[in-house]
Design a protein with these regions (language model features):
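Contiguous, well-folded functional domains in the mature portion of proteins
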Residues: 1-159
């Protein structure tokens, strides 16, 4: 975050941007886990959306938490219901606690294998502590990895 308490998160994937309410999973679509955006990937590499560090890596390798320098907490979830794949199409390139630069590869995954198993590859990027921020989607349609995707502005503390 800068002096204005604002941060830009970049697209962690190459693909098509989707509003969360269009995601075919009720928990994500209704914002139960937080606000954010989703990308339907065309390439199977999930990258760091900002400078920060890896929080928790899920045992099934389909999801991780990411702590953005400045305070935002993210959930990056590759595909919908892909926990059932038990990690098979996912290769994690980082470890818990590892510092990462924006654009650094976090997880490589096989889009074809996920789809062949009957799963949707739509990948939500959730701001878990979204109650602390005002979010603005910066991109529509097709995006490349590293393209500005989401602006976070820290809300004023209530007095």
């Amino acid at each position: 975050m800068n002096e204005k308490q604002e941060a830009v998160l970049c697209s962690p994937l190459k693909g098509r941007v989707m509003p969360l309410d269009e995601v075919a999973d009720e928990a994500f679509a209704q914002g139960v886990l937080g606000d954010g955006v989703a990308v339907c990937p065309t390439e199977g590499v999930l990258c760091a959306p900002a400078d920060g560090r890896v929080g928790q890596l899920f045992e099934s390798r389909h999801a991780l938490t990411y702590l953005v320098d400045g305070g935002a907490e993210l959930l990056l979830h590759i595909g919908l219901d892909t926990v059932a794949l038990k990690g098979a199409p996912f290769t994690v390139k980082v470890r818990e606690g590892q510092s990462c630069a924006r654009g650094e590869g976090l997880v490589v995954f096989d889009i074809g294998a996920i789809r062949a198993a009957g799963y949707d590859v739509t990948t939500p990027m959730i701001v878990s502590n979204s109650e602390d921020y005002t979010l603005k989607v910066l991109a529509r349609g097709e995006v490349d990895v590293g393209a500005p995707l989401l602006c976070l502005r820290r809300k004023e503390a209530k007095k």
